[in-house]
UniProtKB/Swiss-Prot annotation:
Gene3D superfamilies reported for this sequence: MazG-like (1.10.287.1080)
Organism: Methanoregula boonei (strain DSM 21154 / JCM 14090 / 6A8)
Name of the protein: Phosphoribosyl-ATP pyrophosphatase
EC identifiers of the protein: 3.6.1.31
GO molecular function: ATP binding; phosphoribosyl-ATP diphosphatase activity
PANTHER family linked to this entry: HISTIDINE BIOSYNTHESIS BIFUNCTIONAL PROTEIN, HISTIDINE BIOSYNTHESIS BIFUNCTIONAL PROTEIN HIS7
Length: 104
């Protein structure tokens, strides 16, 4: 995938990240941040708390006009949204299909 004037983007990392998140959910590892987040006693509320926190940090980074920080916070937010999808038992493929549908 490319955007005019930008270098190509390899989206395989998204598939790989989703696979790791699903693996951590199915086979928890006490040394894994993702596993601990998914196993937290607060349940999905803990995951959603992180989504809210990362959303706020992303908004502030954009508002402050700091591209590097915006990139970091976008990655954090995207990761936590993926974890929330897994915690809610929503498959990423459904989200991708919905994006494709909306693109038409």
């Amino acid at each position: 995938m490319t955007h005019e004037g930008k270098e190509p983007v390899d989206l395989r990392v998204i598939r790989e990240l989703w696979g790791v998140i699903c693996e951590r959910a199915d086979c928890p590892d006490e040394n894994s941040y993702t596993s601990r987040l998914l196993q937290d006693v607060k349940g999905i509320d803990k995951v959603l708390e992180k989504v809210g926190e990362e959303s706020t940090e992303f908004i502030l980074a954009v508002k402050n006009g700091v591209p590097e920080r915006t990139t970091e916070e976008a990655a954090d937010l995207f990761f936590h949204v993926l974890v929330a999808l897994r915690a809610a038992d929503v498959d990423l493929s459904g989200v991708i299909r919905e994006l494709e549908r909306r693109r038409k």
